[in-house]
Amino acid sequence: SKKNFLSSNEYQPLLVLDVDHDNNLKINNAVLSEEGLVGRVTNLGFLSAEVMLVQDVRSSIPIISSESSLHASLKGMGLGRKGELNFIKKTASFREGEKLYTSGLGDVFPQGLLVGEIVSISDPVDSEFLKIEVSFFSSPINQDYFLIHAK
């Protein structure tokens, strides 16, 4: 699908894609680029599909890590920003450089779609959780074409 519009709202960016009117698309279909997961379809029009991006602050993606096989929830923090893994206990064995994939839990995204990579892990003294930052592999800013994964 071709990009029609990308809003400038940093925290709740909206991507609109042109689609054929005789498509079999559904709400929550995954949207992909060559680099990995971009987001999910949140609204369908006659010739368009609205996409909530993985960077959206309302986005929460169930992931699994490539090396430690740990599950977590990846939260968007805004377009152009890193995402964060939420509520990770300090005993967890995530590693910097680990790639993160969709886990398939929740039945929104299929299992195994590449999402991002852990770029930093810190241990704040004022929290019982680790602060884990994730770099998203895919951004819609410099791309014009996307694939909508129909279930």
Language model segments and positions:
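A secondary-structure micro-motif
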Residues: 1-151
